[in-house]
């Protein structure tokens, strides 16, 4: 019986990255032997055990055979006669197929160390094509290790393109697709994840709403990058540099889905695209079972980002209506999230990457003033029932109007 550290822990150690989780593989043992040593079995489909003290996972060496569609269509064979090389052969990428024994010796039968040094994401064997989830995993690794210079090997990209032309991707469950997307949204370069999916042809299958944005033009005056799909990737990249909140990043990704619905004869204009995108976002979120937190913010950003961009032109009444509709009174954090997404939208344009966004400061000042209106004072003044709400609304409009005047005066003073 031999124990090896495998997978991400070995890879990240070689890359001098912090190690989050450790996975171990056991060669030459039976489930009964593991249980006699105090390990507790938790795997249903194949033998995985928890260490009696550390609770880390130890899996018996195994091979896999394709028996059906999807990432779950495998039959596993675990036995003491399965070798280290056989187990590593079933893994996705060579950089994930390196093992380390208890003495610290490395075992690298598929040249993963060479690929780490060459910064290549390369599949271990042709069996890679049997698991459609690996298309998403490779896209996620490309995004995760983008700053380290990793690229997808040409033969691996060709295999991913072939896989995207089969029915395998459609067999993925919504939960597994979203799990990979969510992990990517939490990484440093989620835009690379979607760019890779587009490059291999998977974006059109898994996210046709996003694929539809590519090739849709925008006015060059406001969008030097012109293409809506490219703009969307730039916005997602900007959102990722502004915040680690995955809900904001998702909202940035889907804020312009309505532009794909604009009639071609109206191009490059997209009147009402924010509202047109709402049912598209709802459908996408329902299909992939995306959390309500993400969906609600995405709907808000799509619906209101044009208003936020035009904040200085809005009447005070309209600003209060925006605050009411978004329910900022009960959820003030959503204002900051909305503004972050709008800053990303503004900066996600070629040549605008470092521009200021005074609309954000202005709306924050408006909300701060409106929030300071004292309801108790209104009640003390004798207002009752529906009159309280009306008086509160009027007072909020009044204080926002004052903010508006102050802002205009400050801008006038700054103008030479």
UniProtKB/Swiss-Prot annotation:
Miscellaneous information on this protein: A single active site specifically recognizes both ATP and CTP and is responsible for their addition.
Entry note about domains: Comprises two domains: an N-terminal domain containing the nucleotidyltransferase activity and a C-terminal HD domain associated with both phosphodiesterase and phosphatase activities.
Organism: Shewanella sp. (strain ANA-3)
PANTHER family: MULTIFUNCTIONAL CCA PROTEIN
Biological-process GO terms, alphabetical: RNA repair; tRNA 3'-terminal CCA addition
Entry function: Catalyzes the addition and repair of the essential 3'-terminal CCA sequence in tRNAs without using a nucleic acid template. Adds these three nucleotides in the order of C, C, and A to the tRNA nucleotide-73, using CTP and ATP as substrates and producing inorganic pyrophosphate. tRNA 3'-terminal CCA addition is required both for tRNA processing and repair. Also involved in tRNA surveillance by mediating tandem CCA addition to generate a CCACCA at the 3' terminus of unstable tRNAs. While stable tRNAs receive only 3'-terminal CCA, unstable tRNAs are marked with CCACCA and rapidly degraded.
Protein's name in the database: Multifunctional CCA protein
Keywords: ATP-binding, Hydrolase, Magnesium, Metal-binding, Multifunctional enzyme, Nickel, Nucleotide-binding, Nucleotidyltransferase, RNA repair, RNA-binding, Transferase, tRNA processing
Catalyzed reactions per annotation: a tRNA precursor + 2 CTP + ATP = a tRNA with a 3' CCA end + 3 diphosphate; a tRNA with a 3' CCA end + 2 CTP + ATP = a tRNA with a 3' CCACCA end + 3 diphosphate
UniProt gene name: cca
Essential cofactor(s): Mg(2+); Ni(2+)
Binding partners and assembly: Monomer. Can also form homodimers and oligomers.
Pfam annotation, one family: PolyA_pol
